[in-house]
Amino acid sequence: MSGGKYVDSEGQLYTLPIREQGNIYKPNNKVMAEEMNEKQMYDAHTKEIDLVNRDPKHLNDDVVKIDFEDVIAEPEGTHSFDGIWKASFTTFTVTKYWFYRLLSSLVGIPVALIWGIYFAILSFLYIWAVVPCIKSFLIKIQCISRIYSICIHTFCDPLYEAIGKIFSNIRISMQKEI
């Protein structure tokens, strides 16, 4: 309670002191009010995206970073004409660049829609089905684990303790006979 009045069993009226930090809805002190105002709310729908660095987490560094030299290489001693090599390089690079752009413009939005739906369903199932099932299972298994623990302590602990005492009295002596 963050302030108020109550009557004790003898009929005395007491006022409760207001907590120094206030409650969670209306902070009482200025420090908490400033902290709450400083926190900026980030909306996933309005955040800015980086158009220069489009892979900030480096997901595709070793997968799709394929250049001309990674695909086509002429070993020492078997070289084509320099003009052919330059034209091949240009053709490969430009074709890869523009065909990727064409494919991403035609198929990118539908695939993004499909992946968005997929991850929305996955998030929904995880939040509303998986986590509650796991919590429910842990609550149920806790009862079983207590019963199991009692059984182990009741039946197995004395048995293993007795076996330990039996084997603790075994003495081995080695003699070397010449």
Swiss-Prot record:
PROSITE patterns: CAVEOLIN. The modification N-acetylserine is found at S2. It is a peripheral membrane protein. It comes from the Eukaryota. Keywords: Acetylation, Cell membrane, Golgi apparatus, Isopeptide bond, Lipoprotein, Membrane, Palmitate, Phosphoprotein, Ubl conjugation. Phosphorylated at Tyr-14 by ABL1 in response to oxidative stress. Residues 105-125 dip into the membrane without crossing it. The modification Phosphotyrosine is found at Y6, Y14, Y25. One of its GO terms (molecular function) is protein kinase binding. Residues 2-94 are annotated as: Required for homooligomerization. Its main location: Golgi. A lipid is attached at C133, C143, C156 (S-palmitoyl cysteine). Residues 2-104, 126-178 are cytoplasmic. The modification Phosphoserine is found at S2, S9. Residues 149-160 are annotated as: Interacts with SPRY1, SPRY2, and SPRY4. Belongs to the caveolin family. This is Caveolin-1. It comes from Atelerix albiventris.
